[in-house]
Amino acid sequence: MSNNSLYYIYIDTKIKGAFEQLIRYFQSQVFNNKDCISVFCKYYKEIEHLAVEVFNKHNITFKFIKKNSDLSFIKGKIVFYLFNAQSNCRVVANRDLIHVFVTHGESHKLASVKPIIRIYDYVITSGDVGVDRYLKSGIFTQYDINNGKVLKLGDTFIGSNIFKYESNSHSLVYAPTWEGGVPEENYCSISMSIAKNIDKFCKKNNIKKIFIQPHPNLGHRDAKYRYYLNECIDFFF
């Protein structure tokens, strides 16, 4: 264990794309190996092989959590959370630690304003838009904001892709989100009607090429969305 050891990261998810999102935080130095004591990862058979492969590849210390007694923390340290999960509540119950919800991305979706966010000592947001979102939803009050419950961290965008802007390009990128963890949080735009509108737009604007980059979680809750995606791809061809 390094002398720099400051915090833990707790992750509870069966979604394989979540590990790619976590690694990007390390690659962009939001987190780093020296300061991170360990990533505590709730054990699921579905993600066991991937988690071992990813964490070992990037030299990140980790531990699978199969039962509550597997959790062991140094008093006074920080625990960061990137995803909301019921098991987070058990960890947050340890008041010898400081609990910070980072999220893995902000948006105006319902998932960004769930009441469970109140359980953490601090919540990270990018800026005033995020603060306003919490105030309007009633998750936090102005008193909470004034007393530092919500911390503005600035632009922490860590996404990466293969695309770059060219003013003379005749290409279009379509990057639909996934269907969400529950039907009420479904903001996915994949459908034949959308595909036809994209095709019409491309023809009108002399766009010759379409790049499609779906959300890594697409089809996790409802596999038919992968079928919808393939249907749209076939249509474009």
Q: What does each of the following model-derived ranges do?
A:
Residues 1-5, 30-34, 70-76, 92-95, ...:
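Flexible, charged surface loops at secondary-structure boundaries
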Residues 1, 27, 111-113:
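Short, flexible, solvent-exposed loop/turn segments with mixed acidic/basic and small polar residues
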Residues 2-15, 177:
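Nucleotide-activated donor-dependent transferases that construct or modify glycoconjugates
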Residues 141-145, 203-205, 234-236:
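Short helix-capping segments at alpha-helix termini
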Residues 65-71, 222-237:
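Donor nucleotide-activated moiety binding/catalytic core segment of transferases
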Residues 4-8, 149, 170-172:
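Residues that mark the start of a beta-strand
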